[in-house]
Amino acid sequence: MRRYIEIYSIMLRNSLIREMSFKANFLLWMIVEILWFCGQIVFFSIIFGQVDRIGDWTKWEVVLLVGTHQMIAQLFQAFFFVNVANIPELVRTGRLDSLLVLPIDSQFAVSTKQFALDSIVNAALGGVVVCVSLSQLGIMPNPMSILLYLVALGFGVAVHYSIMLCLAAVSFWIVRAQGLVYGYFNFLNIARYPDVIFPRIFRMIFGWVVPVVIIANIPARLLIKSFGQPVPLMLHLVIASTIVFWLSRVFWKFALRHYSSASS
């Protein structure tokens, strides 16, 4: 475990050095993400100019949900997206060989090679929006609620990582699988919508089979006490995320057995 922590810290440091070597690019992408996030807030503001509620969600509760989704999506993008999205290219070019020969777990090797640290700033912006929303709602969460919320964010990132890893692993059979990976990255935006807008069957699918909707809805509900009890909410998130992470691990090992290296 200590060796993995040391390797992870080295990769983080190298990514920071690389990002600082291209400051203009770092700032440009950060600005683009901020503008995109502001666009989401404006989008829901326009909707609430016509209605008072979306289901049982008020305006500032939805803004809190959008801020929560921003934090999860940007943390996922900061620590995992670049690496997972690059797996199809590693397989196609045979450069995956250089990672498989390392004396570390192959999934760890492909998942921690590079980081997009500019996304951390955008995740912090989501946190600011959550705090403003809580203030507007007159909610002062207790330390336990805050702790559960932060833990739930981590599980949300794990769900995104697990699903995307499974899609990227399809590249062991389909040479160009980038479309699946980037398609899911766009699809995950449905997590920013209140779950009540979906029909019951889709709430079941997006809550258990492909649990993308719950990853932001459950953390948000943990802060808005009137929306549910914390124990069943956390239990749902923990069970769903654990299952999907385990399945991604199994599928990665299965897919790896079908890899034909460039040297073979």
Residue ranges and their predicted role:
Residues 1-264:
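Hydrophobic transmembrane alpha-helices and immediately adjacent juxtamembrane helices
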